[in-house]
Amino acid sequence: MTTSTLDHIVHLTPPGSVEETTKQFRELGFNVIPGGTHADGLTANALVILADHVYLELIWFTQPPEAYPPSSPTRRQREQHKWAARPPGWIDYAFLGNGVLEGTNRISDIINGRAATRLYADEVPGGRTRPDGEVLKWVISAPLKADSILPFFCGDVTDRRLRVPTEPSSNTHHPNSALGIAHIHLLVSAAAFTSTLKEISTVLGSQPLSSTDQEAKWQLSTLNGNQLRPPTLVLATPADEAQAQFVDSHSAPHIYEVGFYAGENGKEGSVTTPFGRVVWVV
């Protein structure tokens, strides 16, 4: 199966910030719809669904760690969460998985087989409950290293249309005319560039469309890309002082910016939210 279909991009904000985050993204011209609380009760989300059927997951922890009793299982689970130490902003991105939890056709088996080493951990079940009570289930395939810049995979057990409600069509229409994802721009240090390029190529199952010693680009697919331009995954080393400061301020490789294709008379240029950079591509 293909392992290069973009599913969603994760944007983290401070604990309990649902109303503030929703307001910020609506002010950017996005249509934000309710998501729900995840199965572990630690995180909740809202969604921005695009016409290419990729979505932004606006996620936050429901409580800060100190809200849980010291040494309690929930406190430990909160402190050990893969995103617990991540600063707010664009923190992760997911490709579409196949929903296989056990057996020989797991995403982890496919990628680890390509790599001839263990890049991905064993699959784990996931899910959340929507505000309307609908229970969603999926399977997560995640990189073995918690601070990896490699994508995780989300494979639906229940119907994806329940997780990503693209109907009614108004869910994917945005006042800013955003149509789909143009690019995800990853920044790494020069020392990490070559090894990261190799690992991403292994995950995608293809070499970059273009590559220099400072930048590589891969074309991704989406579930509704027939009438839309495809997104690009960009891996690069810092090209200016602002990008160098960004790399220096993050302990692990990170998403620098997300680009959006804009329709006619749509937004242009770039904007920085309180926690992430957005670029409009016409």
What are these regions (language model features)?
Residues 1-6, 11-31, 43, 50-282:
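Glyoxalase I/VOC metalloenzyme domain signal
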Residues 32-39:
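Conserved catalytic-core motifs of GNAT/GCN5-like acyltransferases
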